[in-house]
Amino acid sequence: MLELKNIVKSFGGNVILDDISLNIEEGEIVSILGPSGSGKTTLLNLILGITDIDKGSLVYNGRDLTRVPMEQRGFNIVFQDYALFPNLNAYQNITYGLKNKPGISSKEEVEELIELLGLREHLTKKIEQLSGGQKQRVALARTMVMKPKILLLDEPLSALDGVIKESIKDRIKTIAREYHLTTIIVTHDPEEALTLSDRVLIINKGKISQYGKPEEIINRPDNSFIREFILNQLEIKRNNIFSLFQCGLTA
């Protein structure tokens, strides 16, 4: 279990995160959702260890990691821009981290991930030859071969089109279930968060607005911000889609 206890973070005298407390269960998919500037990326960086915690504590399976360096936490991230090496092919990118830790994944385990993520036919391609969805899968595979204790994903679907987006969502779910891997995702899109996650953490102005299962958030929003930020967006999207089909029926 990952426990965040009364986390506070400020930059230049501005409070970015204010008294954040929550638990994330082993194997759970949790999305951190909020508008731009809400503090969600800062929270992800605090968990990863890129950014120091000012006040409060971060505990993983009973061990206090608050002052533990990023390299010793065992958490891995897939960045929004994938951060792949353009001079290497897909397979070389996937296995790059094993140069420093050669025994962490066996050849069979690497092959299993390649099959799971549908990358077999793309292994010899350079990164520039891959589509956005293929790059995302390579980045996922590269992270997974390092056997992270927690998988962090920063806006993993933002640059993908609809069909590819659904495919990547399914693969993220499969990875979390197959490996019983705690997965934390940052997103600004309510639909992504609600359809991908076991629970959703909604942040507004550095504070927790609501933390619960998707159905709880939809059916029992805690405050007006939840209704306006989430439910209104979903309602607008639904009405737009409905109007398109209505136009098609009357054309």
Residue ranges, per PLM feature:
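A short, proline-enriched helix->beta-strand linker immediately N-terminal to the Walker B motif
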Residues: 145-149
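Conserved ABC ATPase "signature" region
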Residues: 105-122, 173-174
